Amino acid sequence: GYTAWDPTSYAFIKDKALCIPTAFCSYGGEALDKKTPLLRSMQALNKQALRVLHLFGNEDVKCVRTSVGPEQEYFLVDREMFDKRKDLTFCGRTLFGAKPPKGQEMDDHYFGAIKPRVAEYMADLNEELWKLGILAKTEHNEVAPAQHELAPIYTTTNVATDHNQLTMEIMQKVAARHGLVCLLHEKPFEGVNGSGKHN
């Protein structure tokens, strides 16, 4: 197959190694990775959006670019508490146990004051992401207890996708330095809101 550098997505240094975002396809053009279909869909949207705009008489537009800012929701759990739950350590989610004593009536948590330990984690995370050129505009508590959200600055779709993959990896590494575990599973706890990724 062919390996091609995606020059629209920035190269970066991770753990003293230069990482270059690439696309990989077969000699016949079949996609062998997850990036090639994304790049092709961006091209298809550009082509069809231009066609529609030109039909409506807007001939000045030469290119249509998609952008996205995937807000990443996550749970932060103390490492000692996490290690006591084998289902969490093996599956990243709870499989048994009693339902929480309260449901979603803890509305004081959503956008409430961030606990100092979590604020330190978020500040450290921001710095690590900044080193990779990933800018976050908002971090806040989410609805469920111990649930939080990071909202990045919008950027071109393929760059935002690369940034989100890096963000999830860095979130877990930074959490470990703070004695925490970052759970990215969409529904780690039954009976409370799950984590989503939305625009």
What function would you assign to each model-found segment?
Residues 1-184, 192-197:
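Glycine-rich, acidic/polar active-site loops that bind/position phosphate-bearing ligands
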